[in-house]
Amino acid sequence: MLIIELLKAIFFGIIEGITEWLPVSSTGHLILVQEFIRLNQDKAFIEMFNIVIQLGAIIAVMLIYFERLNPFQPGKTAREVQLTWQLWLKVVIACIPSILIAVPLDNWFEAHFYFMVPIAIALIVYGIAFIWIEKRNAQQEPAVTELARMSYKTAFFIGCFQVLSIVPGTSRSGATILGAIILGTSRTVAADFTFFLAIPTMFGYSGLKAVKFLLDGHHLDFAQVLILLVASLTAFVVSLLAIRFLTDYVKKHDFTIFGKYRIVLGSLLLIYSFFKFVF
């Protein structure tokens, strides 16, 4: 029944809206949830669905940060306009590693890593990394406390960290936040740049998935279009809340709790995979 599929789409949209911005891996969570709750659709649609519903999350970022990201915003001084263009240049530079590395390798990683064990391992590894980095930095002051002070070189290397998220379970936001902190930025700068970098990255990735889906000879019927729209709209609404939560959270707390969550979830997934294999 279509109503059941739409309820599932709402549920997946909630998962996407929450996990896209928290450093816990949205794709990993969607794949995990679909072990137990699946859309009654073919594999090609589900693979495309998992990526394209990110469009709702991207639009949420664009809405929240529209004034900050718009160089033509009325009332901006010449200096503020210059800083906005510089920010966009940093974002473009940070996209280069993904264009050169992640895009060509995407299909291979999708074929070999999109199942439970690699997701679990990635969750645990990066969970440990978050805890270790936060302990290492506990007594250190970040070198970069404003986006305007971030160098183009730093932006490029943050983009290199983003490439790591090609492995499901890594988390795009987790990889870029972790990379930014390692490179000396504050948590606030790391989170902000992650949000901004998501706009071209996720638009491009979602677009590629949609085009590939169509070029492979698939088509969308009315029900599938409705499922995508409902899931994306839900992801948009939930993302508005998740982004505001994370921006407020990082002003007062570190990312240790997310590291612990990743380790616990990854461990449970390994146990589940073991029993599923044995029994």
Swiss-Prot record:
Belongs to the UppP family. Bacitracin is thought to be involved in the inhibition of peptidoglycan synthesis by sequestering undecaprenyl diphosphate, thereby reducing the pool of lipid carrier available. One of its GO terms (cellular component) is plasma membrane. Keywords: Antibiotic resistance, Cell membrane, Cell shape, Cell wall biogenesis/degradation, Hydrolase, Membrane, Peptidoglycan synthesis, Transmembrane, Transmembrane helix. This is Undecaprenyl-diphosphatase. InterPro entries: UppP (IPR003824). PANTHER family: UNDECAPRENYL-DIPHOSPHATASE. It is a multi-pass membrane protein. It comes from the Bacteria. HAMAP family: Undec_diphosphatase (MF_01006). One of its GO terms (molecular function) is undecaprenyl-diphosphatase activity. It is found in: Cell membrane. It catalyses: di-trans,octa-cis-undecaprenyl diphosphate + H2O = di-trans,octa-cis-undecaprenyl phosphate + phosphate + H(+). The chain crosses the membrane at residues 2-22, 44-64, 85-105, 113-133, 163-183, 188-208, 223-243, 255-275. Its EC number is 3.6.1.27.
